[in-house]
């Protein structure tokens, strides 16, 4: 392994040129591309002062820098990329550390990432995230809520959504626990909620056996042991690249014992089945309900997917997923390819337009998140 100094554009083009195979094994089977992935490894760790946990929780974020603004900016240097992928870890006792990372390349391929500048002016954000008719579906009944893939969606005590991505790990948006300056109130005692039937036998009670109302559900909460937030989110808010790094990983104090959804590198939008994405979350206009939606991707940059899936605050942090054919195992598999972040108000060719935005899991981000989960880069060679 050897670090590659200078601009990461060479790694990016190597990835695009040789890092993936043909996206289709057959015309009717959209197939997960095979990537050769970089390695992100810790180099040093420093102890930091305890945070004050004074920030107000934000259930959505916004940015005025749209696709063209994003695409027109230069790639980060190697040193900048290392800074963005370095991360803070917060522990349940309130202590925290900062870990610097190195980026390494195996088999002559790697990854690069674009970021936005803050020079683009934008309109003020509108208060809606619903486009035309509300196309969201509330999921009712334990037969659906407790089964895959809906059972992978969990609720954070700060008000956001998360997705189960390993036996003890939850992927969510960074802004759900950190505002870019400090941690939000309640993060030190952060909990993750799992829907379960309100009654032990899964029924509705003796007097409700014939009721047509949906079965009552409740949340069972598990405390979070530690959280990881990339420095790109913390440092990036100073120059408007933060949205590219709006993701965080939570480690639970004990296993959740549910089926989880693996993470994967986000394919180009044109390779997604039907050009669509899916996600489920706990939108705050439908309290207590898990809300599912799917929609077409309207535009993309290297780090973001722009879409108009109907969503409301509270859905932030939802795992964006697709279902594609896994050639090696000869089976269909869903993977998380992004994290729903929030709303963006964009000037498109002189005409205002608004989007909902998801952070893509790029090869570098995959390598980082996978290492957080596995603790061994050798287990993170397949995206």
From Swiss-Prot:
Cross-referenced Pfam families: Trypsin
Alphabetical GO biological process terms: proteolysis
Glycosylation sites: 93, 207
GO cellular component, as recorded: endoplasmic reticulum lumen; extracellular exosome; nucleus
EC number: 3.4.21.-
Annotated compartments: Secreted
Disulfide bonds: 160-176
Chief location category: secreted
Active site: 175, 240, 316
Any GO molecular function: serine-type endopeptidase activity
Family to which the UniProt record says this protein belongs: Belongs to the peptidase S1 family.
Protein name: Serine protease 23
Biological source species: Homo sapiens
Lineage: Eukaryota, Metazoa, Chordata, Craniata, Vertebrata
